[in-house]
């Protein structure tokens, strides 16, 4: 959706096309709180205020978390290259003011945390969380068109990635670092191995 004087509009890109080799199964299909993790994350993004949710998935027929969800699918036609191919397509296709990129395997993510990420200081500025472990480019808001232009420039002289785009944005002033305190840091912990999985989202109790 286009920029309006009284409203900042952002789309979301949910990254669900990874091969999940260490997990041994598709992370997006893990059942959490009674629904597939993919559907849970779509719900959280909607509650946070996303205008459109794009989903980057592995090549092949697009599954659907719910026939009622207003979502758009992006086929990852370059497996093994990480999140970049899906992010590039979404940056080019979205007509929102910004794109919030989210990895599907962050089970403790909350709509409240996502709203903080999607609340930049001003129009044209994105936000990227930073914990003591570093920047979190797979849960960050990238402003358009600056991020799209930067991604193409990076692709011309090296291997592009969300991290490189974010670092360039910080350097050029169109990405803002959002410090994350210890209480909120669990929202950014991902699941990588079978032992990490739980049918209850971390932090919600039994």
Model-based region annotation:
Residues 2-160, 167-187, 195, 201:
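Nucleotide and nucleotide-moiety/phosphate-recognizing core
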Residues 203-206:
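Terminal amphipathic alpha-helical/low-complexity segments used for targeting or macromolecular assembly
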């Amino acid at each position: 959706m286009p920029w309006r004087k009284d409203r900042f509009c952002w789309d979301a890109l949910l990254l669900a096309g990874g091969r999940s080799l260490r997990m041994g199964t598709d992370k997006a299909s893990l059942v959490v709180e009674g629904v597939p993790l993919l559907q849970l994350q779509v719900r959280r993004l909607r509650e946070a205020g996303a205008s459109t949710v794009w989903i980057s998935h592995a090549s092949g027929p697009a599954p659907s978390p719910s026939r009622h969800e207003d979502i758009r699918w992006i086929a990852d036609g370059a497996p093994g290259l990480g999140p970049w191919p899906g992010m590039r397509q979404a940056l080019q296709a979205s007509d929102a003011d910004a794109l919030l990129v989210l990895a599907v395997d962050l089970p403790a993510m909350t709509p409240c945390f996502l709203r903080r990420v999607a609340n930049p200081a001003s129009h044209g500025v994105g936000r990227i969380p930073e914990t003591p472990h570093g920047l979190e480019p797979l849960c960050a808001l990238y402003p358009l068109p600056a991020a799209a232009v930067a991604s193409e420039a990076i692709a011309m002289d090296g291997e592009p990635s969300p991290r490189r785009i974010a670092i360039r944005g910080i350097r050029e002033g169109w990405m803002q670092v959002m410090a994350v305190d210890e209480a909120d840091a669990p929202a950014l912990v991902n699941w990588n191995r079978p032992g990490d999985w739980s049918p209850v989202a971390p932090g919600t109790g039994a």
